[in-house]
Amino acid sequence: MTTIPRKGSSHLPGSLHTCKLKLQEDRRQQEKSVIAQPIFVFEKGEQTFKRPAEDTLYEAAEPECNGFPTKRVRSSSFTFHITDSQSQGVRKNNVFMTSALVQSSVDIKSAEQGPVKHSKHVIRPAILQLPQARSCAKVRKTFGHKALESCKTKEKTNNKISEGNSYLLSENLSRARISVQLSTNQDFLGATSVGCQPNEDKCSFKSCSSNFVFGENMVERVLGTQKLTQPQLENDSYAKEKPFKSIPKFPVNFLSSRTDSIKNTSLIESAAAFSSQPSRKCLLEKIDVITGEETEHNVLKINCKLFIFNKTTQSWIERGRGTLRLNDTASTDCGTLQSRLIMRNQGSLRLILNSKLWAQMKIQRANHKNVRITATDLEDYSIKIFLIQASAQDTAYLYAAIHHRLVALQSFNKQRDVNQAESLSETAQQLNCESCDENEDDFIQVTKNGSDPSSWTHRQSVACS
């Protein structure tokens, strides 16, 4: 009997040797960090316009590594020769070659030739690996049952490592995509384990918060019928001891019905009933505000700033800002008006100016927005210089109103002085007339007595000598 050798049986010992080498490399990579270090290789390009003869050798070497069917690989018209010893097997700039085939050929060359020192560094793109299930299926087709068992042991070790480092891999998923095949497998397992956690948390949250409303049925947990009836009985006994005080009494049936109604109503219904009740408004007593200006008539009211002049520092000091009022008080017996200036500070309504207008009061318009006046200070009741700062229109109205009243006061004082002078002259004349009348009366009395006026004069002269 002749035995027909199975296809690919000649390559089985070599493939097992390469698989063992791959397992050793993977274990070394597991001991290292999860993310592989990038390797930088600098290339020198040489333009060639002909396909090199090495492509035929590469096509013949490909079925020996992974069992892929032989395909003719076309190189681009412009290729670059690479000086790296590891990349001698397959061209990196080959457009029609996948990254997986390039990597497998490089690994086989490195396994056969042993470790080779890098003469230069090459910048390589990210390696996109196939899923573990497909790779295992390909290994089963190419290498047989022994290779499949080694692949399963490799998956078990990957699962153990992924369980130990799941939290680290979940944080670095974006970086681990660039790593080697082991790290990609760990990322896949770590992502599945992490993805299951939010679902478990959601299920536990739903089970905990099943139809629970905060604050609902508080009466069942805090108040009971016995707790309500006992204080009520104590109140009844206290009412019997003091009959003069009226205390409302509720029967026990009323309290039980009330608690039953509270239990039956839900939180939403009780809130709606509470909001539907009329709100209790607190009525405050009205207080009459007395300012002392009730009997006065307001003539002018402006918003302004008040400054006072300090003689020691020769500067203006702001007293405050607020509302300035010019009020006319009741007229006197002579028919004149008494006016005063009142100003209160804005906000606190503190009195900062309260001065009457008098005839000797000085007023001067400094500019179109400022007016200087002399008024009495509330602190020491002395006459000081004040500056009123307001808008141009308000300043004009204030100056005109004060000036008009000062002119009226001055004219009234002049008229009063004239009247006083006239009254003094009249009283003097009356006194002179009375003295003349007295002398005439004395002369008439002497003549009536019958005495000679010549003898009266003689006697008078003798008396004088």
Curated annotation (Swiss-Prot):
Q: Do you know which Pfam families this protein is assigned to?
A: Ran_BP1
Q: Which UniProt keywords apply?
A: Cytoplasm, Nucleus
Output the PROSITE patterns linked to this UniProt entry: RANBD1 (PS50196)
Q: Where in the cell is it found?
A: Nucleus; Cytoplasm
**BP term (GO), one:** mesenchymal cell differentiation involved in bone development
Q: Name the source's superkingdom.
A: Eukaryota
Q: Which GO terms describe its molecular function?
A: SMAD binding
- The RanBD1 domain extends over 276-417
What the entry lists under Gene3D superfamilies is as follows: Pleckstrin-homology domain (PH domain)/Phosphotyrosine-binding domain (PTB)
GO CC, sorted alphabetically, is:
cytoplasm; nucleus
Principal localization? nucleus
This protein's record includes keyword Cytoplasm: yes
Complex and partners: Interacts with SMAD1, SMAD5 and SMAD8; the interaction (with SMAD at least) increases when SMAD1 is not phosphorylated and mediates SMAD1 nuclear export.
Describe the task this protein carries out: Nuclear export factor for BMP-specific SMAD1/5/8 that plays a critical role in terminating BMP signaling and regulating mesenchymal stem cell differentiation by blocking osteoblast differentiation to promote myogenic differention. Directly recognizes dephosphorylated SMAD1/5/8 and mediates their nuclear export in a Ran-dependent manner.
Q: What is this protein called?
A: Ran-binding protein 3-like
Species per Swiss-Prot/TrEMBL record: Homo sapiens (Human)
Q: Which gene encodes it?
A: RANBP3L
